Amino acid sequence: MAPIPYGEQAAFFRAALFLGLLKGERVVRWADAVIARDGSAPAGFIEVAATSPEDLTTLRHALLTVCGEKESAAVVRALLGAAGRDLSAGRRSFKDTMTVLKQLRASIAVDRALNDRLKTLGVDVALAGAGTGPAAAAEQRVREWLRERESDADAFLEAR
């Protein structure tokens, strides 16, 4: 598998920070590793590496020096995969995962088909009512849909 271009990886990290899918420490470690191995890495990596991992706003701004503002379809798929991994691993509750999906749909440009799918999943969960049989079925549909996307996050989450 070919390495992910720096701009794509930075776009993933930027959006993942916004959605709460990653911590700043992970992003700073990545920038440090890129600087250590690639003498021709874009200068923006120095700004990312020098940013406090706790200052997510500044970190996201620094990542913009490496990537564009619009996330590619591959980045969006990876974000969904990362959300699915967190849900499957128990790092995020179902309710919080639905909030992440809502934020993704509202804040990140997604294609029409994905927008419609996210909207349908959200409406199904909202209409089903908590603690009912239909709610369990709606939750299961979301879990299965996200599980199918988990591998899309692999290369982005394993970037060094």
What is the predicted function of each stretch?
Residues 1-160:
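Acidic, Ser/Pro/Thr-rich low-complexity regulatory regions
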